[in-house]
């Protein structure tokens, strides 16, 4: 059976096309070799479980590795201390029973089996004693990996368990204990504590303050994506510009593992194996239209955390910037969920896919009540001529509707909402056929660059808040430079002008060898 791209559950090298993560495994092994206890807390569908499965094999030559998971455990397992401790022992024995523990000694098997059969595990103290016996009798150093620790996040008994492991860690020079402990989940232990005790005084008091930093970048690089595509190309003998495809996929995903694999899967299965920039764009268009657990989680989290939602909205529609400060709750929680990241000391949306999905989500909340959206819906058929989008006419019509609908509003309203209103007008025009995205690197409070991809043709529209002639001149220069980057000869400038003597309308500007069509509203 030929290999497939996989986005559901664990990936296996003999069944699925995978990025080679040996370099990441080597970095994690360094932490294990150093006897570190640490947490792999990364966003949903970030390849944590697949990485841990491969890590067990990577460590097998030197360590006895117990890899257990809290996934699927019912509430009964956490009801009492005795029940929880018994469950831990049973999970360890299950791993042995199914030959999942490398370098396991018969003495260790006997200790765990006897503890279960004779009901020796009654509380944390007896569990601690059994764990010490396991580590004492194992020939190889013992590593404990626990996946899906979020499942235990609402239970105090799990925090007590962490406290017990911490106590053993602090006494490791005199008492046998685990060589290394790895916990994996979305939440870090500080936030687990917060979920159990809402008291602000206690939310920072983590029982896991022994944990080392986990500096491993688990996102995929262009080179890693390229390696995976080379394997696919070798097996399928298709015509593929591998480097170009890898770079384009990375530009959309910033290496987010699920999104990388999903785009590849869509190209392979639903885009006719069209391994080109256009094929990637087609896959992205499908991806942005579908529901999946990752996008469902994105929507749920910004509903649950209004501070995060407000920050994302301000970044996207008002071009506001936020210095990256992990002590800020919204920034901390947004980073933990993988929606934002730090770049050059500033908060940025984690990737172009999330950014466009958020734009679509926020805009969709206004569609039924937005007059400008309804205007775009009515106008849309007149903009397509011989399969080509007439962007000049789109901007001209938007200018007319904008003055008719919003002409009497204040400058503050226009400055804060102009860009959002243009996106609302544009959305029904390209919906179902084209894509758009915002260039995050150039977005600020006065400028937003929109790139529209419609049937293989790209259009660059720069939206400017205009205060003064000199500022507009710089806008023309910036747009011309951007057109050069995209190898385009024509670009569009939509200016929201706040000068008293402004002249509204459409004009064409020749800037070097570039043609700029400017609409002033």
Model-found features: residue ranges?
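Winged-helix-like regulatory helical subdomains adjacent to P-loop NTPase cores
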Residues: 221-337, 343-344, 372-381
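Acidic-basic catalytic patches of nuclease active cores, encompassing PD-(D/E)XK
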Residues: 394-437
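A short, basic N-terminal segment
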Residues: 1-36, 189
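P-loop NTPase nucleotide-binding core
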Residues: 30, 34-46, 50-161, 179, ...
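The catalytic "switch" region of P-loop NTPases
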Residues: 9, 151-244, 251-252, 266, ...
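Conserved catalytic cores of phosphodiester-cleaving nucleases, focusing on short active-site segments
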Residues: 422, 450-452, 456-467, 482
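Active-site metal-binding core of divalent-cation-utilizing nuclease and nuclease-like domains
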Residues: 425-456
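Nucleic-acid nuclease catalytic cores
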Residues: 472-476, 483-512
């Amino acid at each position: 059976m030929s290999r497939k791209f996989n986005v559901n559950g664990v990936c296996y090298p003999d069944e699925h096309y995978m990025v080679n993560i040996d370099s990441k495994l080597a970095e994690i092994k360094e932490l294990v070799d150093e006897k570190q206890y640490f947490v792999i807390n990364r966003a949903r569908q970030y390849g944590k479980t697949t990485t841990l499965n491969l890590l067990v094999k990577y460590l097998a030559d030197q360590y006895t590795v117990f890899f257990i998971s809290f996934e699927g455990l019912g509430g009964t397992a956490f009801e009492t201390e005795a029940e929880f401790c018994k469950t831990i022992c049973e999970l360890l024995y299950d791993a042995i029973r199914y030959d999942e523990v490398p370098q396991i000694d018969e003495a260790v098997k006997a200790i765990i089996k006897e503890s279960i059969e004779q009901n020796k595990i009654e509380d944390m103290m007896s569990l601690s004693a059994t764990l010490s016996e396991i580590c004492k009798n194992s020939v190889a150093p013992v590593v404990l990996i626990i996946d899906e620790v979020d499942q235990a996040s609402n239970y105090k008994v799990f925090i007590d368990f962490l406290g017990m492991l911490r106590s053993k860690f602090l006494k490791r020079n005199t008492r046998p204990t685990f060589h290394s402990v790895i916990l994996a989940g979305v939440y870090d232990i500080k936030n687990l504590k917060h979920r159990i005790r809402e008291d602000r005084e206690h939310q920072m008091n983590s029982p896991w303050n022994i944990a080392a930093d986990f500096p491993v970048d688990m996102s995929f690089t262009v080179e890693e994506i390229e390696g995976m595509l080379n394997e696919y190309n070798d097996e399928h003998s298709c015509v593929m510009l591998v480097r170009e495809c890898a770079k384009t996929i990375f530009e959309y995903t910033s290496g987010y593992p699920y999104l990388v694999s999903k785009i590849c899967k869509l190209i392979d299965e639903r885009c006719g194996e069209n391994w080109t920039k256009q094929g990637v764009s087609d896959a992205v268009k499908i991806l942005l239209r579908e529901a999946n657990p990752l996008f469902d989680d994105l929507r749920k989290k910004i509903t649950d955390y209004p501070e995060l939602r407000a920050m994302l909205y301000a970044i996207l529609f008002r071009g506001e910037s936020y210095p990256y400060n992990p002590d800020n709750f919204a920034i901390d929680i947004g980073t933990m969920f993988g929606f934002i990241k730090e770049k050059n000391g500033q908060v940025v949306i984690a990737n172009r896919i999330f950014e466009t999905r958020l734009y679509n989500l926020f805009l969709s909340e206004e569609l039924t009540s937005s007059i400008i959206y309804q205007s775009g819906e009515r106008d849309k058929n007149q903009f397509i001529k011989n399969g080509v989008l007439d962007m000049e006419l789109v901007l001209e019509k938007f200018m007319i509707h904008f003055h008719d609908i919003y002409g009497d509003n204040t400058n503050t309203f226009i400055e804060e909402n102009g860009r959002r209103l243009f996106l609302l007008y544009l959305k029904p025009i390209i919906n179902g056929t084209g894509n758009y995205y915002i260039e995050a690197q150039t977005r600020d409070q006065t400028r937003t660059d929109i790139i529209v991809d419609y049937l293989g043709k790209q259009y660059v529209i720069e939206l400017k808040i205009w205060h003064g002639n000199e500022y507009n001149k710089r806008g023309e220069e910036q747009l011309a430079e951007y057109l050069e980057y995209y190898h385009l000869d024509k670009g569009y400038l939509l200016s929201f002008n706040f000068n008293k003597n402004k002249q509204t309308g459409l004009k064409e500007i020749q800037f070097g060898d570039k043609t700029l069509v400017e609409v002033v509203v």
